[in-house]
Amino acid sequence: MVSVNGVPAARLPVTLPGEDRASRKAPDYLMVEQPPFDELMYTIGETIELSCAAEDASTTTKWCKDGIGIVPNNRTSTRQGLLKIINVSSDDSGIYSCRLWHSTEILRNFTIRVTDLPSSGDDEDDDDDDDDETEDREPPRWTQPERMEKKLIAVPAANTIRFRCPAAGNPTPTIHWLKNGKEFRGEHRIGGIKLRHQQWSLVMESVVPSDKGNYTCVVENKYGSIRQTYQLDVLERSSHRPILQAGLPGNQTVVLGSDVEFHCKVYSDAQPHIQWLKHVEVNGSKYGPDGDPYVSVLQSFINGTEVDSTLSLKNVTETNEGQYVCRANNFIGVAEASFWLHIYKPAPAEPVEKALTTSSSSITVLIVVTSTIVFILLVIIVITHLMKVPSKKSMTAPPVHKVSKFPLKRQQVSLESNSSMNSNTPLVRITHLSSSDGTMLANVSELGLPLDPKWELLRSRLTLGKPLGEGCFGQVVMAEAIGIDKERPNKPATVAVKMLKDDATDKDLSDLVSEMEMMKMIGKHKNIINLLGACTQDGPLYVLVEYASKGSLREYLKARRPPGMDYSFDACKIPAEQLTFKDLVSCAYQVARGMEYLASQKCIHRDLAARNVLVTDDNVMKIADFGLARDIHNIDYYKKTTNGRLPVKWMAPEALFDRIYTHHSDVWSYGVLLWEIFTLGGSPYPGIPVEELFKLLKEGHRMDKPANCTHELYMIMRECWHAVPSQRPAFKQLVEDLDRVLTVTSTNEYLDLSVAFEQYSPPSQDSHSTCSSGDDSVFAHDILPDEPCLPKHQQHNGAIPT
């Protein structure tokens, strides 16, 4: 091999005539002498400008760094024979060459060195200064130990990593590198390494997971040796569309002629393509024939994995007003944020004389209007006072429905005169009174509730059956009701009836009434448990809802796990129906549709889990207990202020730590429910104590992909578990995504029987009730898959949680 100015010549592989390249064991090389190297030195932040020219001006040239073609980006630009790099960093150090296009001929070579300080060429210059200060012999020592404190380095795959061990000594020490305790050289790694001895550094480009390990620099001279070990962790890139920082860019209103800036922060593992767009009109229309809006591209560029992009508009005019879009896309998908720019045009100033005249007139008008209003108010007060005295004598108390068996000490049921048949307003309003102790309601038989003809069912048409389950304050029984089905009024229908227990309090009564009224307002949907009727007159309160014969989704899935495993309920019993992968996707899709409907009704569930989804005889998923949620109307969050029982393992971090509930926190819970579905009723975070769970969630840990789950569905789960609530998908988006997955899924794709589900199941079950309302109830039985308040007698044939 030939060297030019101490630099090895280029090696070019040559294929001999008539020879198959693939058949050779090792390539032959043709030695090509390179032109001399121009050595140039720059300081971090400066601009590099290099040039070369071919003999023929029409010949195209290209630029390479360390033998690899240079791709223009936001810092690097190339033109015919010119290379420009702005804001250089130490990573820009290397060998640059100018070559003829489609040729191996090199026109010019440059050795570029980028240093930290203008006064020194490299780290070794500082070391020489240290050596000049003393004539004593000394062992090696670190010159910049503060830059070596970070010993654990984690980077995404395909990034460039550099380890540095700047040192000094007399005589000047040498440096070599070890990986996992063994000598490390370029041939040990695909892609090779770069050893920059003058900078005491090791550089690896485009790292991959196999590059993980411990890297040790050994610095030594004849008087001693020192070493430093770095741990490298290479993270797999996640397949995720770009993420835009919430709240950016925001709407702005500026004065005509001023300047304005919009910021858009983009996060993406894959390099994103970022565009700034403005909505425009074409021939008076904002939309094209295909329904897509017309837009003009203001800016467009490709950048790194974390980008803070800015759109600057100078001296804005009325034509700048309108809707804008920041759009980012990678090979996974697209994310965009719309915002508006409004232009304020100040009115021209009025002449001084006219302004004074207008001001005087305004004061006069104001005085006259104020006097008139005061006079009218005085007249109204006098008339009201005169009418009030006789009205007291003639007033008679209207008839009031009274609670005949017990007083409501803490809360009172107040009556409305209008029916709820044609109104979304609750018929029964709960008002809080000042008294307090949660009195027990023994032997409840009559309530002073108003008659609602739309929902009322005569007790004579209802036949109660066997109990289905009971909770902390209520119970559910199966029943036969006549007249529920309007098309077949004389045919009995099977329903579930919610009622209070004997030891229920007035608070429990209030909750059941509120749940009934909430179900009235929310309306009907195929994928929620619908209200069928109520018995409110001449006896205890009965709330009739749809009956789901196959019980909760969690028990439904567990009962249909593949046979022959230790986790089966009965090892000798084969499930009546075997689930396919499409069945599981269908379950997820139906629950998403139900939650999409509840979200459209401004209803936050707060306790979405497989145990609160019921399954009908036709395998229809129905969300239950949403009536216990809060109607948020104009406020998109509900902040819990009491220390009630909380389903910890299903709760979003903002709900867990800040007690803030939104539709976004319901989406997090839906992600956990997805995990339950694809583990066939597994317990989330198996084996992890609650205290440890808090810590793991804060650190960003998430559950692993279930065995019977595709990568696409797992990425949907991970999107539901995004740390930023506003970045989680809406239920509408989840419905669209799952509908697409459902469409392309085969109906014959059965589950993998080799997967053991015991890893997702708790080690034991406990059937007793844990209805404590104390602060510690959240942690009392974390090994159970359900929240701490469990039903006492859970059946599998249609029990509806209360």
UniProtKB/Swiss-Prot annotation:
Protein kinase domain span: 462-751
Binding site for ATP: 468-476, 498
Protein's membrane topology: Single-pass type I membrane protein
Residue ranges constituting the Ig-like C2-type domain according to the UniProt record: 27-115, 140-233, 242-342
Compositional bias segments (type: Basic and acidic residues): 137-148
Cell membrane listed as a keyword: yes
Activity regulation statement: Present in an inactive conformation in the absence of bound ligand. Ligand binding leads to dimerization and activation by autophosphorylation on tyrosine residues.
Pfam families the UniProt entry points to: I-set, Ig_3, PK_Tyr_Ser-Thr
Active site per database record: 607
Compartment annotation: Cell membrane
Family to which the UniProt record says this protein belongs: Belongs to the protein kinase superfamily. Tyr protein kinase family. Fibroblast growth factor receptor subfamily.
Function: Tyrosine-protein kinase that acts as a cell-surface receptor for fibroblast growth factors and plays an essential role in the regulation of cell proliferation, differentiation and apoptosis. Plays an essential role in the regulation of chondrocyte differentiation, proliferation and apoptosis, and is required for normal skeleton development. Regulates both osteogenesis and postnatal bone mineralization by osteoblasts. Promotes apoptosis in chondrocytes, but can also promote cancer cell proliferation. Phosphorylates PLCG1, CBL and FRS2.
Protein name: Fibroblast growth factor receptor 3
Organism, as annotated: Xenopus laevis (African clawed frog)
